[in-house]
A protein has these predicted regions:
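Beta-propeller folds
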Residues: 1-181
């Protein structure tokens, strides 16, 4: 058994970690209270290639695939998806946020800006490049807005100040550059 990911809420009251067993890429996510160390929710299972991005203490975003038919070790997985897990609810009620047919053969990762106003998703190609999508979490019916498309560059947003995102990219910059979006 090995630790794959560890993530704390901003308040540090809760933390979640993922473990892998037997060298598998498939993980389990376990959520605990930092004061009591007691597990506070069911274990999330069948999670693959995922981070853990907390939204307050309400819940967190994570990535996975549909559970494959057949062997977990040899089945093809090609439609990565981002879900939101609300604390206190079963994994079967997790909300699909993005992914599926529109992102075939892509690795999706979700993270939030420091103030948790924006959900940022990177859709990475299997070889080079990524697309960036951003959703304003303060607007009830907000849709994802494409910031970079085409998988022709690798870009990562590292800071959001007010309504400006700052990113590092190699788009038209082989040695990379910082841009404001």
């Amino acid at each position: 058994t090995s630790l794959s990911t560890l993530s704390f809420t901003e308040s540090a009251n809760l933390f979640a970690y993922s473990i892998s067993e037997g060298g598998s890429d498939w993980n389990k996510i376990i959520i605990r209270n930092t004061q009591t160390m007691k597990q506070i929710d069911d274990t999330l299972i069948d999670v693959k290639f995922s981070g853990i991005a907390w939204k307050g203490e309400e819940g967190f975003y994570y990535s996975s695939y549909d559970k494959p038919k057949g062997s977990m070790l040899s089945a093809k997985t090609d439609m990565h998806k981002i879900y939101f897990h609300k604390i206190g609810t079963p994994q079967s009620q997790d909300q699909l946020i993005l992914g599926g047919d529109d992102f075939k053969r892509r690795y999706l990762s979700a993270y939030l800006d420091e103030k948790e106003n924006y959900l940022i998703v990177s859709a990475a190609n299997t070889t080079y490049g990524n697309e960036i999508y951003v959703k304003d979490l303060n607007k009830k019916d907000a849709k994802f807005v494409a910031i970079q498309t085409g998988y022709t560059a690798s870009t990562s947003i590292f800071k959001v100040i007010e309504n400006t995102a700052y990113a590092i990219t190699d788009l038209d910059a082989p040695n990379k550059k910082v841009i404001a979006i």
